[in-house]
Amino acid sequence: MSSHDNADSPSSSVANAVTAMKIEQHDGAADMLLSNGGDAVLKRDSNGLSEHAVTAKDYPGMNDLASSTVKSRTSSLTPIKTENGDSTAKEEKVGGDITVKMEPGQPPKLSRSSSQKVVAQPPQLFLHLPDSTAEAQSTFEVMETCTYANKYMGYTEHAMECDCAEEWEPSLSRNLACGEDSDCINRATKIECVGDCSCGAECQNQRFQRKEYANVAVIKTEKKGFGLRAETDLRPHQFIFEYVGEVINEAQFRRRMRQYDEEGIKHFYFMSLSRGEFVDATKKGNLGRFCNHSCNPNCYVDKWVVGEKLRMGIFAERAIQAGEELVFNYNVDRYGADPQPCYCGEPNCTGFIGGKTQTDRATKLSNATIEALGIEDADSWDTVVAKRPRKKKMGEDDEEYVDSVQPKSLDENGVTKVMAALMQCKEKWIAVKLLRRIERCDDDRVRHRVVKMHGYQILNSQLTLWKDDFNVVLQILNILDGFPRLTRNKIIDSKIESTVQPLTTCGDERVEKKAAALLQHWATLEVGYRIPRMKRDPNAVASVSQFGRREHTTDEQKRSQSRSRSRSPSLDAPRGPANPGRKSNGPRNSQHHGARQFRRQFNPLPPGWFAAESHGRTYYYCARGDVTWTRPIHAAPEAEVPGQQAKNKALQGIIDNILNAKENTPKEKTVTPGTPQASRETASLNEGQERWRSYSEEKQKKLYENTLFPHIKYVVDKFKHKLPKEDLKRYAKDVAKKLVNSDFKNNRVEDPTKISEKQQKKVKAFCKEFFDKAVAKHRAYEQRKAEKQAKGGNSKADDMISGHNTVEDDVKLSDGEAEKVEENDNSMSSDPQGILKRKREDEMDIGEGAAEEAMKRQKSSTPIPPPPPPPPPLGDEEQPTPNGTGEDDFLAENGVSMLHSPGSAPTPPPPPPLSTEHSDNDEMGQSPSMSNHLLEQKSFPAPLGEEYEADSGKLSSNRIGIEGQV
């Protein structure tokens, strides 16, 4: 082996190093191997004529080239096929992603390949490490949920409901709606369902709310400190833990950074929640804070909308085995922290966490945002377009990098990612890129998908967020103008009209014109009718109904995925019968499974008719007392109560008198106040005093009664010890009503809020005379009662009735007497005609009151049972004896039973007499000897007391009202 020295060659030029190599190509294959940081050796086959070795010491640029690689690759030999099929051209991969290409007659060339993947390695398990969860929890304060510096921190709009239906699985006793395989809109846009969704209670899209954390344990690693280990196997995208901590703003974040640095805290636990908001889990949090960093992670962090808050969770990136450490790529600048060494041990490890080393080499955008922007990784772009996207340069901003890459066109499947990213987007340049993808799309299916994925609600929030930038506003209005417009339902639900309305006067001519045209188009749409959703009370106790769910536990039952109701149904080709050759005249379903269904009565009875049963036969009756064996086909006649017409006429007369009295009552003339000349205070005072004129008559009477009450109470207090308390209160109310009605009837009330001194004296005098008479009557009643008790005369009930009438005589006062008291106050007690007149009117009032009470009792009491039918037919097995006492005995002896008894049905009367066609002795089981015995008696009593005479087969009643022949 001969060495080759070339000390004058530049160390930084890799091309010169390759060109300086002198390689002789022979028939055999030549391999060139360059190790990372090692020597480069050129080997030949056994028949080679010469060999040449190039070391890294000779060309220092080789070391720089090898050390500059980010991803290390294994060496491989990739031949290049030529047109004649000979593998004369060779590709040799040296360290990392560098390949040496050698072609006949051409110097070797170095090329960089970006499509090589990291070699898959088996996951490293940490089952040998002990569980250090208790020790780790002692280093911080455990929290269940995030705390917020103020109520506006972490706030986001949420008024969206999914269209999924409840899917109850009886075998699991769970609601499987909104699962991973479903088409749930909320789940696709990273929104959790709340209690008022149509998918039912406790659906599968409530993982944050129910804290469905994975089974994990804290372990203590050798170099990374505490870490998180999976105790069970995890499936892809499974929710592992929520990142819980204190949500603070940017000023507090920077202050805590300095504070923790002064305290000597090396490990910071800050995560960016949104623009200007951070989650600090340094001193308060949960086990999610122990999830370490890795350059090849098995987890990822995602943000979800839960209610009105934005929350952060850790999810599985791939299938994870039990014992693996749970890690995710921080992929962000550590907010000014110094870069730390990375101990993940992955082949693609950058060597540092945070700082410029990691930030400049990779974008800070999350994978979800990159996919939403249409920027895929290099491997995916190799199969999509011819031109591969370039990598991010050192020091290049994310916005500049995204601008330099052409995004993919938006398809129907990509709408979900775009709308989910737009829902949580707080960066303007990212929002503009996402909106541009939607705006450039002309496919109607994609636009329908955008509307379905809460398009109006999400664009409404973006319109509110960027309303000061007219370019972004105009971009959103153009998207809204391109939406398919069928109904106004989604527009009303999103409340976007109230956001667009102020834009018509914003000052920008383009925005004003576009907003006005959009509102005009929306106004022409109709509102589609939808069944209103039942409002659930969250505090109500859940009542389980036995008819709520029908749980079938058969093995053949299969669960259908929850699909959106707006999705078009699948079209199936029509099919013929399963077995067309089978012919059967028998019933299709001869076996009944379960309880029989309730069958409604085929031919119900006409209104007013009821049915009863006697000796196995059915007869019909009505409330008036009519009975028949024949089924009626017309409604039953109404039963007339005796004296009903007279009472109706009397009531109608009373109503007419009241109406006529109201018409004859003169209306008060409202005095129009003049133009106020006083100050504003006087005008407002007069307005308050005259307000009673706008009240109704009933309210004015109540106001006037309250004005009279103090003067009436003054008199009532004088009679406290002379009358019982209850009687005194009742008399006071009655006398107040009498005075108020009398004064209003005679137009003596000028102002119901005040009365003059003269009126006060008259009121007191009237009340004093009234109560004096009441006391005298009460004493007389007590004296008579004592005498009757001493003599043992009438019963106590009679005394109570007479006493009641006496008291009523004192209470009932006429309006004429009140007028007389007002005209002549001093002569009220000495006028016998007024007293007699009052007594006569009181007697009339008591008579009318008694009649009204009797009518009320008659209405509320049970109606009189109808009269019994004619006697039973001849030849019955059992007949009433001549000493029968009435209807009850007759029913008991004939064994009458109810067949159909509605709630309002009267007591069924006995069955009617059978006609000739119904009097078959053999069928009814009657005895001819009993019939002959009754005929020999010539007469027998009927249930109502009439006597019937039996002569030659003819029965006739001695009283009017019952006729018929048997």
From Swiss-Prot:
Q: Which residues form the SET domain?
A: 214-331
Boundaries of every AWS domain copy: 157-212
Pfam families named among the record's database cross-references: AWS (PF17907), Med26 (PF08711), SET (PF00856), SRI (PF08236)
Top EC group: transferase
Q: What is known of its domains?
A: The AWS and SET domains are necessary for transcription repression.
Instruction: State the similarity comment.
Output: Belongs to the class V-like SAM-binding methyltransferase superfamily. Histone-lysine methyltransferase family. SET2 subfamily.
Question: What's the protein here called?
Answer: Histone-lysine N-methyltransferase, H3 lysine-36 specific
